[in-house]
C-alpha cells in the first residue's frame, strides 16, 4: 500500500525527513516557499561542532544525509577538543554553502519518490483528530497521510537591523504568513524566539597578514561512514582567528541603544549559548577580548563570515566596529548583520516520536520546536521522518534513549522540558557522554539502523569485518601478559598483568603498544583509539549501562495521554502538576522530568498495573 507524506520546508530538518521517508518507501511532497533556498545555510557555513558533530554522525549511521552532504562540500575539517577527553571531542567542517545547496538539489532530482513543490502552506487539513493534508496559499490542497512541519525561522519572521525592521525570512526571503496562526487556532501553544547573523565582508578588502591562521592538522576526518576519500590537508582552505579589543568594546557599549536587541524592538528570547557581539560585551564587561573566526562561505563567493560577531546594530555602527578589527581597516560589506525573530511551538506538545499530541500523523521538527542549529534540526527531521513512515506502515515506533544517542538526549529534553530560549545541544546535557562519543557511532546505532533497513550493505560488511579484527586484538590483550612482551618485561615489575589491564593505565596508548607486539593487527588508528578508550573507561560505562537498563525497562510501560494524575494515590502534588502539563508517553520519559522522583514513578506504575 502506498502512503504520501508532505514535508513543509526544505531546510536541514525538512531534507532529512524527506529523504529518510523516501528510503522507507513513502511518496514525499517536499513543499517549499522557494526552491532556490532548499538546503540553504543562512547563518554559519559549517556543519558540526561540540556535540553537534556527533549528532551529524549519528544521523549518518541512521541513514541520513547531512554527513554525506558535508563531506561532499567540505573546505576544511577540524577535530575539536583534541587535547581534551574523548567524551567532548567532535568534528566540525567548514563547508561550501553554495555547493551544499547544489548537492541536495541533485539528490532530490535523482530521487524518484520526492517531488519538490513550490508553494506556501497556510493550514493543516484535519478530520477526526487525524491529519489529512495541507492547504496552500492559492487555495489548493495536498492530500497526505502524514505531514511534517519543518518551517525553520520562517513563521511570521521579522528581521531587525538597528531601527529598521522588515517582515521577511532569512536572507530577505519570503516569510510564512498564516501557518502559525492557524496552528494556534488548533490549540498549539506558541512562543517567540530570536536569533541573529553576522555581517558578510568582501575578502579582497581584508589584510589577512594581521590575522592568526587556523588550519587543520588532523588528517583523515569525515562525518560519513560511506566517505571513501578524505580531503587531503594540503587541499583544505585556511580560516583565520582575530579578537575584539577594548576600543571596540567601548564603541559597542556607547551605542547599545541603537541595537535592536537593546532598544526594545525585539521582545523574543535569543540563544543563550550564541549571543550577539553586543550582548557578549554587555554581559561580560570584565573580558578584554572575544574571539572571532573569519571563515570563507564558498569557493564561488568573495565573502567571509565572522563567526562570533552576530549583531543587530544599524549599518553605520557595524561599519565602525568591524573596521576596528585586526585586518579589517578597509573592510567592505556585502551584507550587514541582522537579528531575526520568529514563531516556534512548545515542544512538550510532542511525543518522543515528534508526532504532535493534538493531531495524529502531524509531526514537528527543527527550529519550530525551539531548537537552534543545523544539526539539531537535521536530527529531528530524521527521527520525525522515520516515525512518520513506521506509523503509516503499522510498525513499532523508533525512539532513542538518552544513553543511546545525543539524538535521544535532545528529543527527551524537548518533550519533557519547557523551552524558553533556543535550545542548543551541549556535551554537558548528556549525563552519559563517556558512551555517546564521536568514535563509537556504529557500535551504538548500526544494528538499530539495520533493523530499519537503512544501512548500506558495504558499510555493514566493513563494520562486521572491523568488529572481528577488534575482537582478535582484545582477545590477545586479555590472554597475553606484560612478561610475554620482550620490550615490556624489563621495564615493568608486574609482569603477570595482562596487556588488557596494562592498557588501562592513563600513560599507556594502545596505538603505541601494538608496535611492540610480535603479532600484527590490521586496524587503523581510529579503531585502535576506540579500543583504547573502551578499555580505559569500561568501568564507568558499565555503571552507566546498569543505571540506564532500569530506565529502559520503564520505557515499555506506556502511559495513556488522558491519564488523570489526580486519581493516582500517593503521587506528589508537584508531580501531578508537571505530568499533567507534559503528558509523557511512558514511565522512562516521566522519570526524566525535573522534580519527579522514583516514588512518583512507582506510584504511577502501581496505578497502571491495577487499572489496565
UniProtKB/Swiss-Prot annotation:
FAD binds at residues 9-14. Its cofactor is FAD. The keyword Transport does not apply. One of its GO terms (molecular function) is flavin adenine dinucleotide binding. SMART domains: GIDA_assoc_3 (SM01228). It holds the Pfam family GIDA_C_1st. It is found in: Cytoplasm. Keywords: Cytoplasm, FAD, Flavoprotein, NAD, tRNA processing. SUPFAM superfamilies: FAD/NAD(P)-binding domain. One of its GO terms (cellular component) is cytosol. GO terms for biological process: tRNA methylation; tRNA wobble uridine modification. NAD-binding protein involved in the addition of a carboxymethylaminomethyl (cmnm) group at the wobble position (U34) of certain tRNAs, forming tRNA-cmnm(5)s(2)U34. Homodimer. Heterotetramer of two MnmE and two MnmG subunits. Belongs to the MnmG family. This is tRNA uridine 5-carboxymethylaminomethyl modification enzyme MnmG. It comes from Mycoplasma pneumoniae (strain ATCC 29342 / M129 / Subtype 1) (Mycoplasmoides pneumoniae).
Amino acid at each position: 500500500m502506498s502512503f504520501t507524506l508532505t514535508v513543509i520546508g526544505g531546510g536541514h530538518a525538512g531534507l532529512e525527513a524527506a529523504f529518510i521517508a523516501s528510503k522507507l518507501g513513502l511518496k514525499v511532497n517536499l513543499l517549499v516557499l522557494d526552491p532556490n533556498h532548499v538546503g540553504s545555510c543562512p547563518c554559519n557555513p559549517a556543519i558540526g561542532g561540540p556535540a553537534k558533530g556527533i549528532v551529524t554522525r549519528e544521523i549518518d549511521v541512521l541513514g541520513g544525509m547531512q554527513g554525506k552532504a558535508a563531506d561532499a562540500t567540505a573546505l576544511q575539517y577540524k577535530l575539536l577538543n583534541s587535547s581534551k577527553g574523548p567524551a567532548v571531542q567532535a568534528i566540525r567542517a567548514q563547508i561550501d554553502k553554495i555547493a551544499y545547496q547544489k548537492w541536495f538539489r541533485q539528490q532530490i532530482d535523482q530521487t524518484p519518490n520526492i517531488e519538490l513543490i513550490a508553494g506556501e502552506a497556510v493550514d493543516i487539513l484535519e478530520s477526526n483528530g487525524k491529519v489529512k493534508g495541507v492547504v496552500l496559499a492559492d487555495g489548493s490542497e495536498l492530500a497526505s497521510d502524514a505531514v511534517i512541519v519543518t518551517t525553520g525561522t520562517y513563521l511570521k519572521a521579522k528581521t531587525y537591523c538597528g531601527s529598521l525592521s522588515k517582515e521577511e525570512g532569512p536572507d530577505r526571503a519570503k516569510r510564512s504568513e498564516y501557518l502559525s496562526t492557524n496552528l494556534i487556532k488548533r490549540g498549539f501553544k506558541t512562543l517567540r524566539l530570536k536569533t541573529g547573523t553576522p555581517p558578510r565582508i568582501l575578502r579582497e578588502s581584508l589584510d589577512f597578514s594581521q590575522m592568526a591562521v587556523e588550519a587543520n592538522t588532523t588528517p583523515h576526518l569525515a562525518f560519513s561512514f560511506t566517505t571513501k576519500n578524505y580531503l587531503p590537508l594540503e587541499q583544505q582552505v585556511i580560516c583565520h582567528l582575530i579578537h575584539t579589543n577594548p576600543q571596540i568594546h567601548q564603541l559597542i557599549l556607547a551605542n547599545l541603544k541603537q541595537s535592536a536587541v537593546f532598544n526594545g524592538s525585539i521582545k523574543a528570547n535569543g540563544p543563550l549559548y550564541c549571543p550577539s557581539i553586543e550582548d557578549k560585551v554587555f554581559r561580560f564587561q570584565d573580558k578584554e577580548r572575544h574571539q572571532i573566526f573569519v571563515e570563507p562561505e564558498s569557493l564561488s563567493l568573495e565573502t567571509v563570515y565572522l563567526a562570533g560577531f552576530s549583531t543587530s546594530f544599524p549599518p553605520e555602527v557595524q561599519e565602525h566596529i568591524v573596521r576596528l578589527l585586526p585586518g579589517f581597516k578597509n573592510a567592505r560589506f556585502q551584507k550587514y548583520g541582522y537579528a531575526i525573530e520568529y514563531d516556534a511551538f512548545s515542544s512538550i506538545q510532542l511525543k518522543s516520536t515528534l508526532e504532535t499530541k493534538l493531531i495524529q500523523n502531524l509531526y514537528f521538527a527543527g527550529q519550530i520546536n525551539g531548537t537552534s542549529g543545523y544539526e539539531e534540526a537535521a536530527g529531528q527531521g530524521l527521527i520525525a521522518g522515520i516515525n512518520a513512515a513506521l506509523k503509516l506502515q503499522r510498525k513499532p515506533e523508533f525512539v532513542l534513549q538518552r544513553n543511546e544517542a545525543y539524538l535521544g538526549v535532545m528529543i527527551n529534553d524537548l518533550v519533557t522540558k519547557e523551552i524558553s530560549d533556543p535550545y542548543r545541544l551541549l556535551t554537558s546535557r548528556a549525563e552519559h557522554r563517556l558512551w555517546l562519543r564521536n568514535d563509537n557511532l556504529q557500535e551504538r546505532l548500526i544494528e538499530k539502523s539495520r533493523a530499519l533497513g537503512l544501512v548500506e550493505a558495504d558499510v555493514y560488511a566493513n563494520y562486521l569485518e572491523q568488529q572481528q579484527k577488534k575482537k582478535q586484538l582484545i582477545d590477545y590483550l586479555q590472554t597475553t601478559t606484560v612478561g610475554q612482551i620482550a620490550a615490556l618485561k624489563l621495564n615493568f615489575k608486574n609482569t603477570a598483568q595482562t596487556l588488557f589491564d596494562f592498557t588501562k593505565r592513563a600513560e599507556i596508548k594502545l596505538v603505541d603498544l601494538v608496535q611492540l607486539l610480535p603479532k600484527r593487527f590490521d586496524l587503523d588508528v581510529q579503531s585502535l583509539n576506540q579500543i583504547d578508550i573502551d578499555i580505559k573507561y569500561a568501568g564507568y560505562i558499565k555503571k552507566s549501562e546498569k543505571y540506564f537498563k532500569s530506565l529502559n525497562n520503564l520505557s515499555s510501560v506506556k502511559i495513556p495521554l488522558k491519564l488523570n494524575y489526580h486519581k493516582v494515590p500517593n503521587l506528589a502534588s508537584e508531580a501531578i502538576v508537571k505530568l499533567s502539563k507534559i503528558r509523557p508517553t511512558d514511565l522512562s520519559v516521566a522519570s526524566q522530568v525535573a522534580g519527579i522522583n522514583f516514588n512518583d514513578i512507582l506510584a504511577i506504575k502501581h496505578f497502571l498495573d491495577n487499572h489496565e
